[in-house]
Amino acid sequence: MPFTLPESKIAIDIDFDPDHLRQRFEADKQARERKDQLAQFQGLDDVLEVDDSDPFSEPITREPVTEELDALVLGGGFGGLTAGAYLTQNGVENFRLVEYGGDFGGTWYWNRYPGVQCDIESHIYMPLLEETGYVPSQRYADGSEIFEHAQRIGRHYGLYDRTYFQTRATHARWDEQIQRWEVTTDRGDRFVTRVLLRSNGALTKPQLPKVPGIGDFEGKIFHTSRWDYGYTGGSAAGDLAHLRDKRVAVVGTGATGVQVVPYLAQDAKELVVVQRTPSVVQPRNNRKTDPEWVASLTPGWQYERHDNFNGIISGHEVEGNLVDDGWTHLFPELTGQHLVDVPVGELPEGDQALVAELADMNLLMSAHARVDSIVTDPATADGLKPWFGYMCKRPCFNDEYLEAFNRPNVTLAASPAGIDGITSSGIVVAGTHYEVDCIIFATGFETGSGPAGIYGYDVIGREGHSMQEYFSEGARTFHGFFTHGFPNFVELGMSQTAYYVNFVYMLDRKARHAARLVRHLLDSGIGTFEPTAEAEADWVAEVRRSNEPREAYWGACTPGYYNGQGEVSKAVFRDVYNSSEIDFWNMIEAWWNSGRFEGLVFEPARDAVPVA
């Protein structure tokens, strides 16, 4: 249908009615809104009926330790691993890592469900490839290969000898007298460290919906991050032979559900897919890594690939498209430039916003068309179509998910209200009772309750100030790293740092920055570093300003973790700096090169004080 931009009067050819879509989006949002918002979920460890123990490693027995350190890293996922790697590269030797899991890997240690893969090309997702001499075997690596790479990094940099596994931090307190952090653990350990680096990860604490009757179910229940292969048989590659006589319900159709459904559909006697909100699912087009391409690689190839990918999704001019994936095609399309014959940036501001909205809708219609082209049952196809802005939820890329709904043993149980309840023999969705032997929750992780709530410990800074309280209205940092009143503390997560889609690239860059600062502290006789209150406030204001356009978008979205389940003030991305990653890291590099460390205050090291 022809559509005319109101200010510039430029005609656009689209095949959908924007007003109809807006109305449908609002109806979908209202159907899924809940008064309890984030409170609708509970931690896996709060549900006694569902096992939260580690199914992958035998318990480690050891005595408590007391150590004095230059640096302590909390977390052994890719954030902690890259921190350890760059500390080592910078000649820092007296450091340790503390990790809750039984090995390195973080989310890749815990998530070993069938079909688990990354949704970012593995050649730019997996860090330190050149440094460790490894090239992934396929475009989108399986979780097992990513986990093995985490182990490879640990071995390469000697981090196994520096790490305490199956250990949780329980408390961190700044001691002003000795200019050190004191950190205790659930093992009775006591670490006294000059610098504390936190990299506990965004996907740390599994969550379940608060469903009545969960304790009444007499069958098997588990979360995808605690996959029970003893019950299902098989491995992450599939062949779940023990399910061939089982009726299974999988709850959740986000990134995990989309990956695991094809494997359950292949092996379960019956599969019920419980869906509250459908996902956008576009082609993945995975393939093996070309040996000739590997042979052609020259030093610096991974960083060149990073820069090219980030340049495209940030809207920079780059030479070619090295990654050529769903993300690098998606972000240029979101600008809407392909819809008009003039540069979008030259349009009146109102028309620019409208073109972006139409581009978003156009992408969603392409996702609908893909559903219709694959799913043969019209009612099921309609149930699998999302009705919300394309970027309201992280889009998925998979080549087997939609096809699974053509199998006779697969049923879609869709309801905007989610699960009504669980009985002794099954699950109730939209008033229909489904008899099942096993319920698998693919319901993700806590993302919106704040760092202290997720990580299970508080950080106490100067004058007894609690970081949990200090962050009660959102993160407060300088450049996403440092917080006023919490000297020598470095946050390695995504809070208030530029980040689009490649989480591990962000972790890698933050770890490099942090390790340089630790080295500088050790070399310069510095006792403490800490941002000024003014520098922190200015950065928080800049982050808030950058997110104003996104907050308006998320406010119109169906509930999900991007928008805090409708509570936008607690949205996971509210505290991410909405800026080009290239521009952000160029700014950080310029900050270093100036030599002024603007925004930080350094205090000299005091005379050594014995640690009691």
Curated annotation (Swiss-Prot):
InterPro entries: FAD-binding_Monooxygenases, FAD/NAD-bd_sf, Flavin_mOase-like
Pfam assignment, any one: FMO-like
Cofactor dependence: FAD
pH-dependence of activity, as noted: Optimum pH is 7.5. Exhibits more than 50% of its optimal activity between pH 6.5 and 9.0. Displays highest stability in a pH range of 7.0-8.0.
Keywords carried by this UniProt record: FAD, Flavoprotein, Monooxygenase, NADP, Oxidoreductase
UniProt keyword Zinc-finger, yes or no: no
Coiled-coil ranges from the UniProt annotation: none
Site keyed Transition state stabilizer: positions: 394
Thermal response of activity: Optimum temperature is 35 degrees Celsius. At this temperature, its half-life is about 20 hours. Retains about 50% and 20% of its initial activity after 20 h and 48 h of incubation at 35 degrees Celsius, respectively.
Family the entry assigns: Belongs to the FAD-binding monooxygenase family.
Name of the molecule in the record: Baeyer-Villiger monooxygenase 4
Native source species: Dietzia sp. (strain D5)
